[in-house]
Regions:
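Conserved CoA-thioester-binding segment of acyl-CoA-metabolizing enzymes
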Residues: 14-73, 107
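Glycine- (often His-adjacent) and acidic-residue-rich active-site loop
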Residues: 72-108, 124, 154
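Crotonase-fold acyl-CoA enzyme core
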Residues: 107-222, 245, 250-254, 259-262, ...
Length: 272
């Protein structure tokens, strides 16, 4: 039996020269995709998610690309979903938003037949945490940290966090850090097995080294190995993403959530 993610999604192809929220470069068989919305702490909006999905689709089809690295521009990996866009943009349900954006992105990363590295150069929160956890490997800068984030605005975990996080660090720790919203340091994440390696001043060189090693490896075997791991560990990924959407739909209607968002935008502590 082989796990196949069945969700159908639409990808709108964008030429690399037209990308507004990503920077793209190649090196020794690796494609480096840099989240580039510095004015918004590299938070995700519809445009960035579409551009990232398009870039991954192109990388999958390009025989010259044998490994993909996702990182953040500047000192931040990503603050997660751009809350301002959700407040000001098209009025769709949270469930529909996930089905259009993060769910297909997470499934695409896991089903991609090439290794994907999250090079976590700085703070990583919310949906971006889910994106990083979906990648095959995580390399963190020593000053980076992870924040589950969702409970701060009275939401349930989404973007696969409810599935990935307990698998990496156990259910008790996952619930503790969801409830408390405390940061997980790079050092702690390494000790718990949530990240594979941590680099200080040598972070960039470490990422290049690991990406180069993967790019020079057996491509077809790596693709088969990833399928095997998906089958063994993540057979319920698609169902988990769907269920997260159901829960988020309900959480998004609560007075607690409205208070959480208002407090976030006003930069004050919420009163739940």
């Amino acid at each position: 039996m082989t796990v196949t993610f069945k969700q159908r999604v639409t990808v709108i192809f964008i030429c690399e020269d037209e990308m507004k929220t990503l920077l793209s470069s190649t090196q020794a068989g690796s494609l480096i995709l840099t989240l580039n919305r510095p004015e918004r702490a590299n938070s995700f909006n519809f445009e960035m998610i579409n551009e990232l999905r398009n870039a991954l689709t192109a990388a999958e089809a390009d025989p010259q690309v044998r490994c993909v690295v996702i990182t953040g521009g500047g000192k931040v990996f990503s603050a997660g979903q751009d809350i301002t866009e959700m407040k000001q943009g098209e009025k769709i349900s949270y469930r529909e938003h996930l089905e259009r954006t993060y769910n297909p992105l997470i499934l695409q990363i896991r089903s991609m037949g090439k290794p994907v590295i999250a090079a976590v150069n700085g703070p990583c929160a919310g949906a971006a945490f889910g994106v990083a956890l979906a990648c095959d490997l995580r390399i963190a800068r020593s000053t980076a940290y992870f924040v589950v984030g969702f409970s701060g605005i009275a939401l349930a975990p989404d973007s696969g966090v409810s599935l990935f996080m307990p698998k990496y660090i156990g259910l008790g720790r996952a619930q503790e850090y969801y409830y408390s919203n405390k940061p997980i340091t790079a050092k702690q994440a390494l000790e718990w097995g949530m990240v594979n390696q941590v680099g200080g001043f040598n972070f960039d060189a470490l990422v290049r080294q690991v990406a180069g090693e993967l790019a020079s490896g057996p491509r077809e075997a790596f693709a088969a190995g990833k399928k095997a791991f998906n089958h063994a560990i993540l057979p319920n990924l698609e169902d988990s993403l769907r269920y997260e959407g159901i829960l988020q739909e309900e959480a998004g209607k609560t007075a607690e959530h409205h208070e959480g968002v208002s407090a976030f935008l006003a930069k004050r502590k919420p009163k739940f």
